[in-house]
Regions:
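Ser/Thr/Pro/Gly-rich low-complexity, intrinsically disordered segments
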Residues: 12-13, 17
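Glycine-biased, low-complexity coil/linker segments
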Residues: 18-22
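Intrinsically disordered, low-complexity segments enriched in serine/threonine/proline/glycine
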Residues: 23-24, 28
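Extreme N-terminal tail/first-helix region
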Residues: 29-39
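Short, contiguous alpha-helical
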Residues: 37-41, 48, 56-102, 143-208
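Hydrophobic alpha-helical core bundles mediating ligand binding, dimerization, or RNAP-core interactions
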Residues: 40, 44, 51, 118, ...
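Acidic/histidine-rich alpha-helical segments that form the ligand environment
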Residues: 105-141, 149-163, 167, 206-208
Length: 208
């Protein structure tokens, strides 16, 4: 039997199977946001586990003059987060008070300062993400006067932050040397790791 739907301006949008598209869309966006937050938390943890394996001097070590230290990358991430996520839904993500160039000059000099800036940036981002309401997904977001959907603006940062966190981990491995402990699957252990994971299919958390 063919179903016939008559939709007027006041009717909810309906799928061919009889579902409410608007309701389904809201549920989908909540699932998306939950997934995004989970991924951000994962990469945040990777960086923090790296901080824990690097001594204070190593946090500010540079391979050469053109390279960034872990401290500089943290400055950049914190600066970006504060700029992008402050008034996320109502103002351009590139704030006039941000000094991006200064983020790549050594300003942070201690581990305590580093962690303070780090947490300040992440707190700003998570607070912004958790404040997104159902109607906000329809809004336009601007970054340097370039229009984005809310999803695209989030995805932009979801690609940007892991890029720099990968740099943090790489520098951490160079600094720690033989004392480095793998943050994922140790070399030569993929087979045993996978065997353990597949003992209880469907019950394991994602791991890369």
């Amino acid at each position: 039997l063919k179903a016939i739907f008559v939709i007027n301006k006041t009717s909810p949008k309906v799928s061919p199977t009889g579902g409410d598209l608007e309701g389904a869309g809201g549920a989908l966006m909540k699932e998306y946001l939950t997934s995004v937050i989970k991924r951000f938390e994962y990469y945040k943890t990777l960086a923090e586990q790296t901080f824990g394996q690097v001594n204070d001097e190593g946090l500010f070590w540079q391979y050469n003059e053109e390279s960034n230290s872990i401290g500089m990358i943290v400055q950049h991430l914190a600066g970006n987060m504060l700029s992008r996520w402050t008034d996320f839904l109502t103002s351009d993500g590139e704030k006039d008070w941000r000094d991006r160039d200064a983020e790549f000059e050594r300003a942070i000099t201690t581990r305590t300062e580093l962690l303070t800036q780090w947490n300040k940036g992440w707190d700003c981002m998570f607070n912004a993400l958790n404040s997104i309401g159902d109607d906000d997904w329809k809004k336009d977001i601007y970054i340097r006067n370039e229009r984005h959907s809310v999803v695209d603006a989030i995805n932009r940062q979801l690609a940007h932050y892991p890029y720099h966190i990968g740099q943090i981990v790489f520098i951490g491995k160079m600094v720690a040397g033989a004392d480095w402990h793998s943050l994922s699957i140790p070399k030569g252990k993929s087979g045993s790791f996978n065997s353990e994971k597949f003992k209880n299919p469907g019950d394991n958390k994602a791991n890369v």
